[in-house]
Amino acid sequence: MSKIEQKNQSEVIKLAIDLMSRASVTPEDAGCQKLMAQRLAQLGFTNESMIFADTTNLWSRRDSTNATKEDDLVFCFAGHTDVVPAGNLELWNTPPFEPTIIDGMLYGRGAADMKGSLAAMIVATERFVQDHPDHHGSITYLITSDEEGPFINGTTKVIDTLEARNEKITYCIVGEPSSTHAVGDIVKNGRRGSISAEVDIKGKQGHVAYPDHVRNPIHLAMPALTELSQVQWDNGNDYFPATSFQLSNINAGTGATNVVPGHINALFNLRYSTELTDQIIVEQVESILDKHQLDYDIKWTFNGKPFITEHVESEHGFLNAVSQAILSVTGTETQLSTSGGTSDGRFIAPTGAQVIELGPCNATIHQVNESVSCDDLEKLVDIYYHCLVNVLCTHKTIS
C-alpha cells in the first residue's frame, strides 16, 4: 500500500496498519503497546508498563472526574499485541507484516487476531472521551504480549498485581475474534475450562517372542484410555455443552517390530463445564487408572477454569448493554456462545469481573493470508463506542 493510499484511510484502518506492520511474534511486542500508550496518554490515561521476564504488558487507566457511586465502575478493554508466527512465507499472497488492502479486505498477520480489535478499541475510546469527557466510571486497558505463547508472564501476572493492590475490573471486553459470518453476530459470554495431562504408563521391555518375560504397557494402557474416552463426565447445562475428553498424543516403542516397549506416554485434554471442577476431574481420572492397576506417573496442567457471564433480565445488564450496542450498529441480534478455545478472559473472570469476548470474524485467524474486513473494523469501532456509552453514560449501576 502506498503512502498516498494510507493517507486516504480512516483512523481505525491507519492504526491497524501501523500495529500490523510491527512483527510482534509472541512474546515480542515490537513497540505496539508504546504506540497505544501514546494515543491513550493524549486522552488523560495513566500508563503503567509491567514487564515480567520476556513479556511486555500495559495497564492503562482513565478515571472519572465525577464523585458518584457509578464511578466505582471499571470498564476494561483487554487484548494482546503478540501474534503467532507467519509460517511459510511462500504461501502468503502478500508479505505478512506489510499490511495490504485488496477488495476491501486488510491482509496481514494479526489483522483479525487481534490488532484490528486493538485499533478499534483505541479509536472508539478517542471518540467516546471527546464526546463524553465527564463520563462515569473508569476506562482501563489490559494489554499483553503473551497470549499466543505460554501465558505465564502476561495477563495472569497483571491480574495478580492488580489484585494485590485491590484494583478491580467490573466489566471487561476481550477483543478476541468472536464473530463467525458478520461482525457482532456472536458474543462469547464464557469459556469452558481446560485441563491437560501427560501420563507415562510403565511396563517391562523385552522380546516379542517371549511374552512371559514382558509386561506390554500398550496392552495395559489401552483399556484404561478407552474407558476414559467413554466416560459421560456430565450433561452440560444451559451455557455449556457436555465435558469433552480427547486423547491428543500416544507414543510408545523403539521403532523395532520385535521389541515390546518399556513404557507408553499419552497426552489428553478435557474441556469442561461449570458442572465440574478440576479436582473432580483429577480424582476421577486417577481412580480409573488405579482401577486398572497401572504403574504410572501423571503430570497435570491447569489451563483455566470455566467462566460465564450470565444474561440478567434487566435493561441495565452488561450483556444487554453489549447486545444493544451491536443491534444499534448492525441491526441484528447477537447470539451468545461459549464454544471454542480458551482466552485471557479466564484470568480476569475469577476476580469477579463480568467478561465477554467481542471482535471481528475468525475465519482466517492463525492461517496464511489472515485478513479482516475494513468495513467490519469500522463497525467494530461503532460497537465498542456504544458499549462505552451504554455502560458509562447511564446513571444506574448495571447488573
Swiss-Prot record:
Which InterPro entries does UniProt cross-reference here?
A: Bact_exopeptidase_dim_dom (IPR036264), DapE_proteobac (IPR005941), Peptidase_M20 (IPR002933), Peptidase_M20_dimer (IPR011650), Peptidase_M20A (IPR050072)
Record: residues binding Zn(2+) 1: H80, D113, E176
Say which enzyme class the record assigns: hydrolase
* Recorded superkingdom: Bacteria
The intrachain disulfides are none
The Enzyme Commission number assigned here is 3.5.1.18
Note one Pfam family from the annotation. Answer: Peptidase_M20
Binding, Zn(2+) 2:
D113, E148, H366
| Cofactors (names) | Zn(2+); Co(2+)
Q: List the coiled-coil residues.
A: none
Statement: the UniProt record of this protein carries the keyword Hydrolase: yes
Q: Which GO terms describe its molecular function?
A: acetylornithine deacetylase activity; cobalt ion binding; succinyl-diaminopimelate desuccinylase activity; zinc ion binding
Arranged from A to Z, the UniProt key words for this protein are:
Amino-acid biosynthesis, Cobalt, Diaminopimelate biosynthesis, Hydrolase, Lysine biosynthesis, Metal-binding, Zinc
Q: What does this protein do?
A: Catalyzes the hydrolysis of N-succinyl-L,L-diaminopimelic acid (SDAP), forming succinate and LL-2,6-diaminopimelate (DAP), an intermediate involved in the bacterial biosynthesis of lysine and meso-diaminopimelic acid, an essential component of bacterial cell walls.
- Its family? Belongs to the peptidase M20A family. DapE subfamily.
Quaternary structure, per UniProt, is: Homodimer.
What name does this protein carry?
Succinyl-diaminopimelate desuccinylase
Organism of origin: Colwellia psychrerythraea (strain 34H / ATCC BAA-681)
- The gene name on file is dapE
